[in-house]
Amino acid sequence: MHKYRTHNCNELKISDVGAEVKLSGWVHRRRDHGNLVFVDLRDHYGITQIVFTDQNPQLMDDASRLRYESVVTVIGKVVARSEETINNTLPTGHIEVLAGEFIVESAADTLPFVINTEKDAPEDSRLKHRFLDLRREKLHNNIMLRSQIISYIRQLMTARGFTEFQTPILTASSPEGARDFLVPSRLHPGKFYALPQAPQQFKQLLMVSGFDRYFQIAPCFRDEDARADRSPGEFYQLDIEMSFVTQEDIFSTIEPVMYELFTKFTDKKVSEAPFIRIPYNESMLKYGSDKPDLRNPIVIADVTEIFRDSDFTIFRENIKKGSIVRAIPAPYAAAQPRSFFDKMIEFAISEGAGGLGYIQFSETGEAKGPVAKFLSTQQLEDLKATANISNGDAVFFASDKKDKAAKLAGKVRIKLADELDLLEKDCFKFCWITDFPFYELNEETGKIDFSHNPFSMPQGGLEALENAKTTEELLELTAYQYDIVCNGIELSSGAVRNHKPEIMYKAFAIAGYSEEEVDKRFGGMIRAFKFGAPPHGGIAPGIDRIVMLLAEATNIREIIAFPLNQQAEDLLMNAPNYVEDKALKELNVMLSPSARKNAEKE
């Protein structure tokens, strides 16, 4: 007989009755019934009920003192449960093991929180004792689901002719849009490596190297603030790059991967290929967001022209100053109480708006509300037609400069869906957002900057860049850049790459980079492009966000084994921490006075 187990704790069936077995695991639950002690023994696979009887008083007494989460090995005989004690919720629920002896392999101290229920515990305590937290059923299952998803992704990609690569972790800093994690070089004083924000340049260089289809389950590092769907330190993505492809080639490759992946791990309805394509400007108009949740049936409409010559002075004057008006329908909401409309106004004010106008259309078509009296009968009819409003609906209005009005309308759309319970249930709705602006105005400097990935190919190529003379014309340029969105969550950005040095130099020059600076920062890639670079493109869906969706988790830390907390701290390993002066000296690093003072306190 094996030293620790002949079976796992999810394996024994009624056919095993009479067998002598050995099981090892954790004490999940213990129940003392006087002449009987029951112990639920748990391992990675499941739970088996162990019975200690008064036929062996010493053994039963020892079992009654077992602490939860102690590790024990039990030897005993499999017996059938009586009819009234069968537990059909457990695979082992038709049997139990009558204990003959047991060994405490490792006794547990008093637990900081309960393991055998999903009762919530303070997150800091959970993260500090993550090895305990990971024993809880939901979290344990999430980590197993993550493993299964990644394994299946590898199968899907390999079946489609992709080759898996590993790219460097120590590399140079690059402008992916977030702060780098920097690593000082001991051998090159004053110089620093950066942990990769993404394997962007390396995967493009692999295409230039003659490889055709690349993928990697890639670790990425960005010094960002935490959000519910974003870890503050590292994350993983399904990094993909392909040679000799158009944007549609990339879409048609990724869509079946997403469809097969989601249908494998959920019973919910999943969008079938081809996924809906929505240009960026259309998405901002209809949904007030570049990551729309298509489970929400509300479609926003532009009604600026209806209010341009109306008697509603506030909107009319706003329009004269260059603002717009967006209408956000609220289906079947006309009969809602006044408190509902007041709540929506308070929400808009909390989002920075001055208020939120609205109209209610009764079942008979009568228009009521603070805005209705300022519109003529014809204008009201035009409003209903433009915004697809029916009798019994209400409609809210957002008026501001284009970007602000669009964003407010988008937030109101989401709030209405929540308040009115409009989201379609049990489905995953995918879409592509395409034709992103190539440039944007930097809010801090007021200068032209890249809106997303600087390595994207501008639509129209070099000619489009050269013909755009004014700021307005530059801001109208679009890129072969796209996002894939599911249920309002951006899973990934991607792009057809700029593989021509002359276009890259011009694109960076418009954003204020000299040719020398481009060569300095991206010399390896620019040099490679001068030796024959294939047209190529790619995408990188986020593994963490995919797992979040499939696990129905609301927080990204629930699908990562050892996450950082919201302050980017690892409470289990006490990281980040201060290091000895000797190590700093070897790295030629000197702490600032304030950092030195903090270090001396530790």
Curated annotation (Swiss-Prot):
UniProt cross-references to PROSITE patterns, sorted A to Z: AA_TRNA_LIGASE_II (PS50862)
GO biological process: aspartyl-tRNA aminoacylation
Record's keyword annotation contains Secreted: no
Positions marked as site (Important for tRNA non-discrimination): 33
Region feature (Aspartate): 200-203
GO CC annotations on file: cytoplasm
Compartments, as annotated in UniProt: Cytoplasm
EC number(s) per entry: 6.1.1.23
List of residues binding ATP: 222-224, 490, 542-545
Major location (coarse): cytoplasm
Catalytic activity annotation: tRNA(Asx) + L-aspartate + ATP = L-aspartyl-tRNA(Asx) + AMP + diphosphate
EC main group: ligase
Residues binding L-aspartate, per UniProt: 176, 222, 452, 497
Matching InterPro entries: Aa-tRNA-synt_II (IPR004364), aa-tRNA-synth_II (IPR006195), aa-tRNA-synth_II/BPL/LPL (IPR045864), Asp-tRNA-ligase_1 (IPR004524), Asp-tRNA-ligase_1_N (IPR047089), Asp/Asn-tRNA-synth_IIb (IPR002312), AspRS_core (IPR047090), GAD-like_sf (IPR004115)
UniProtKB keywords: Aminoacyl-tRNA synthetase, ATP-binding, Cytoplasm, Ligase, Nucleotide-binding, Protein biosynthesis
Family label: Belongs to the class-II aminoacyl-tRNA synthetase family. Type 1 subfamily.
Subunit structure: Homodimer.
Described purpose of this protein according to its UniProt entry: Aspartyl-tRNA synthetase with relaxed tRNA specificity since it is able to aspartylate not only its cognate tRNA(Asp) but also tRNA(Asn). Reaction proceeds in two steps: L-aspartate is first activated by ATP to form Asp-AMP and then transferred to the acceptor end of tRNA(Asp/Asn).
Protein name as it appears in the record: Aspartate--tRNA(Asp/Asn) ligase
Gene this protein is translated from: aspS
